């Protein structure tokens, strides 16, 4: 199967999460019984792409063998990229990362660009923590683009990219094959994988969590049992597909938060066959098996966990990716929206579609909010009054919504861009100022 970036893929997908996949676009392109034969079929080059240390435990080891027309080393030297440099990867105090305020923060959507702007040039870092160089923490980016990448290819050496489209489909042509995502779906592109993004709908906007640390995995289910939340079979990894093109192309690399570019005389999406467990994948959030209370109380939001990046402390993740999808609320004599909360973790939220059930207004699709460690947050005044008076003897369906959260164990530090942008809502705090005093010591 050869790649045509302008049309939907028809090579299909392979089902499963972190499976040992094997796929070939030409019959017999995968060597039989070995990884690196003296001569690979069709005159291809064998190349291993390692996502973990060679000696990582087998259950955590991630690598794939690629059989490609030219090795990845074939390109001209890199030089600093002359385009926009709006990405941050080190989150200590700096000109890019000012002191972090304890305020609750919320932003309007990133505006669509006026000038032609592709996926790479449309990226901007809003917040993050840790260090790409030290391989811990994450960066949270937004993207807004109106042009497909034209003879340009991109990869991040800093981390894996969890892409959450909010507007417009993305056709992502990768070394491993084609991944197509639309709003309500996510894509994960592993560290180092080269790709190009086509925008079939013209405009596109969304969110990215760039994970510097341990790779995303499915959470353990504990007493939920053997099924539930995001089921492994619903994750889709592309079949092999390649393009054999020569010409004047550009390869853009992200390393330590900076962009670099190199001339390359061929398309790097030239992998004819591959096998392994280190590969891009997609997931449809509408397939999430939501768990909730059928008696009383609103459970902790950990029941909405899709993917996690584990830390070295059991039970404490570096990153949790959580969603708030359509669901039934059936708890009786219970305040059903998310409750008021202060959290040792830090929470960056986005909205793909509809409205979030804890905010009556102000939090719109494409927008974002940040509630850092121990910053009080919760439903606004209107939501509290309505939910406190609602009839909880009848179930209620929260419909036409898809919100999500990147939750981290360490402080999420907004960038200078995020604190200075016109999209920052200076009046966000007002949504709680109308909360009334109901206390009466004479009436229980």
From Swiss-Prot:
Provide the reaction this enzyme catalyses. Answer: homogentisate + O2 = 4-maleylacetoacetate + H(+)
> Which residues catalyse the reaction?
298
UniProt KW keywords = Dioxygenase, Iron, Metal-binding, Oxidoreductase, Phenylalanine catabolism, Tyrosine catabolism
Q: What are the GO cellular component annotations? A: cytoplasm
User: What Enzyme Commission number(s) appear in the record?
Assistant: 1.13.11.5
Enumerate the GO terms in the molecular function aspect.
Answer: homogentisate 1,2-dioxygenase activity; iron ion binding
In the UniProt record, the signal sequence range is none
- Give, as one word, the top-level EC class: oxidoreductase
Query: Which SUPFAM superfamilies does the record match to this protein?
Result: RmlC-like cupins
Q: Which Gene Ontology BP terms does the record give?
A: L-phenylalanine catabolic process; tyrosine catabolic process
Q: What pathway or pathways are given for this protein in its record?
A: Amino-acid degradation; L-phenylalanine degradation; acetoacetate and fumarate from L-phenylalanine: step 4/6
User: Could you tell me the superkingdom of the organism this chain comes from?
Assistant: Bacteria
Annotated HAMAP family: Homogentis_dioxygen (MF_00334)
Oligomeric form and interacting partners: Hexamer; dimer of trimers.
Q: Indicate the family of this protein.
A: Belongs to the homogentisate dioxygenase family.
Question: What is the official name of this protein in its record?
Answer: Homogentisate 1,2-dioxygenase
According to its UniProt entry, this protein's organism is Burkholderia lata (strain ATCC 17760 / DSM 23089 / LMG 22485 / NCIMB 9086 / R18194 / 383)
């Amino acid at each position: 199967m050869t790649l045509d970036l302008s049309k939907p893929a028809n090579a299909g997908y392979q089902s499963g999460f972190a499976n040992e996949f094997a796929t070939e676009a030409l019959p017999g392109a995968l060597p039989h019984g070995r990884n690196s034969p003296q001569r690979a079929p069709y005159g291809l080059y064998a190349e291993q792409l390692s996502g973990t240390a060679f000696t990582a435990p087998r259950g955590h080891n991630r690598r794939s063998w690629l059989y490609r027309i030219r090795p990845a080393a074939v390109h001209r030297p890199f030089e600093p990229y002359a385009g926009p440099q709006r990405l941050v990867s080190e989150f200590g105090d700096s000109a890019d990362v000012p002191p972090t305020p304890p305020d609750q923060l919320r932003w309007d959507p990133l505006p669509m660009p006026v000038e032609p702007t592709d996926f790479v040039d449309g990226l901007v870092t809003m917040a993050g923590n840790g260090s790409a160089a030290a391989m811990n923490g994450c960066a949270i980016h937004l993207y807004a683009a109106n042009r497909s990448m034209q003879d340009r290819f991109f990869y991040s050496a800093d981390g894996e990219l969890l892409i959450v489209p909010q507007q417009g489909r993305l056709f992502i042509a990768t070394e491993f094959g084609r991944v197509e995502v639309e709003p309500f779906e996510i894509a994960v592109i592993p560290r180092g994988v080269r790709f190009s993004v086509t925008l079939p709908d013209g405009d596109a906007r969304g969110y990215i969590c760039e994970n510097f640390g341990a790779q995303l995995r499915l959470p353990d289910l504990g007493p939920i049992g053997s099924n539930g939340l995001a089921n492994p079979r619903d994750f889709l990894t592309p079949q092999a597909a390649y393009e054999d093109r020569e010409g004047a192309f550009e390869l853009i690399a992200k390393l330590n938060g900076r962009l670099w570019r190199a001339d390359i005389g061929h398309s790097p999406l030239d992998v004819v066959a591959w096998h392994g467990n280190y590969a891009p994948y997609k997931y449809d959030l509408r397939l999430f098996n939501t768990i909730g209370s059928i008696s009383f109380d609103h459970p902790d939001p950990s029941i909405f966990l899709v993917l996690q990046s584990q830390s070295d402390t059991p039970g404490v993740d570096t990153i949790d990716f959580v969603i708030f999808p359509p669901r039934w609320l059936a708890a009786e004599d219970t305040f059903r929206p998310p409750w008021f909360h202060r959290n040792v973790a830090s929470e960056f939220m986005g909205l793909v579609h509809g409205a979030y059930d804890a905010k009556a207004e102000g939090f719109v699709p494409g927008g974002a909010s940040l509630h850092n460690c121990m910053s009080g947050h919760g439903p606004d005044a209107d939501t509290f009054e309505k939910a406190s008076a609602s009839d909880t003897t009848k179930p209620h369906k929260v419909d036409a919504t898809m919100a999500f959260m990147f939750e981290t164990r360490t402080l999420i530090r907004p960038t200078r861009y995020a604190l200075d942008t016109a999209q920052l809502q200076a009046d966000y705090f007002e949504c709680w100022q109308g909360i009334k005093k109901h206390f009466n010591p004479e009436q229980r």
